[in-house]
């Protein structure tokens, strides 16, 4: 509401203060908040920190559920998506957020990204089920390499020598982590063959997850540019479109016999598991929003690198809350992976600070893949 009072209306004569001891100065006019909200929405550092916290929460909650004999992974993911949809719908009803209403044509165009998301989160849950949190986070670094070269192919990115060196450190840390994991499995008491087989299954799921994650991140970045989706639009369509697919996959591919349900939800831990599932579902609200937010205000490579910089607190959570082996090779792998993240950050800073000479573009270049994507959206 506009304040029409003149400046002299706010003046106070000092000799009249004693006559009106109860005088209260009028409140200052409200300050516009649009610029502040815009600066927060486009703050790259804040988006990275938000993604860090949400990814740590989601990883720990998922590991808690999957660390038992839980094998209803599709059901877990469906609960997460359902809780996410309920949460953002309540926020929209309260006027806290806004996003587009459901549109069938937009849903059809976004559905391939949803399938990539389902592939990413399912393979990630399977890898986390077989691997410890430190090993899982270290191997997640390999996704950064795939995404970086994907950006070279589709978004005109480049890889410097220092960036390439950081990639070498990431691969080296993954090798150390795998060797430490296998060494601990062989030397520990119990069936070593069974433990090594479990680790091998985890490595295979991790490889598939790296491919799915890089495809999802690159595809989502390109699709966001073409559809002009905002952060909550992306979160809404990602979770809403994934629910029917996850329900069908859970009903067809997972065992819903009474014995298996009792094994997944034992009476002693049933309440704790259900609470963790709901909490992990709420964490998907933050991970869905902050991941899209981070990709929008930074780049898909920076988004993937956040996971590498997160490895230290995530690994510590695995060592504190779960039975992850604490050995010199495993700690060394964590530290090498963390150093690789620092080297990568320095490489990106130097690359961004270097002036681009000799390049005078008159138009925005469009690759053949980008043009074909735009043509498909028009159809």
Swiss-Prot record:
Residues 17-38 are annotated as: Disordered. It comes from the Eukaryota. Its main location: Golgi. The chain crosses the membrane at residues 40-60, 70-90, 111-133, 137-156, 163-182, 199-219, 234-254, 273-293, 302-322, 326-346. Pfam families: UAA. It is found in: Golgi apparatus membrane; Cytoplasmic vesicle membrane; Endoplasmic reticulum membrane. One of its GO terms (molecular function) is antiporter activity. Residues 61-69, 134-136, 183-198, 255-272, 323-325 are lumenal. Keywords: Cytoplasmic vesicle, Endoplasmic reticulum, Golgi apparatus, Membrane, Sugar transport, Transmembrane, Transmembrane helix, Transport. It is a multi-pass membrane protein. One of its GO terms (cellular component) is cytoplasmic vesicle membrane. Residues 1-39, 91-110, 157-162, 220-233, 294-301, 347-379 are cytoplasmic. GO terms for biological process: establishment or maintenance of cell polarity; GDP-mannose transmembrane transport. PANTHER family: SOLUTE CARRIER FAMILY 35. Belongs to the TPT transporter family. SLC35D subfamily. Homooligomer. Involved in the import of GDP-mannose from the cytoplasm into the Golgi lumen. This is GDP-mannose transporter 1. It comes from Emericella nidulans (strain FGSC A4 / ATCC 38163 / CBS 112.46 / NRRL 194 / M139) (Aspergillus nidulans).
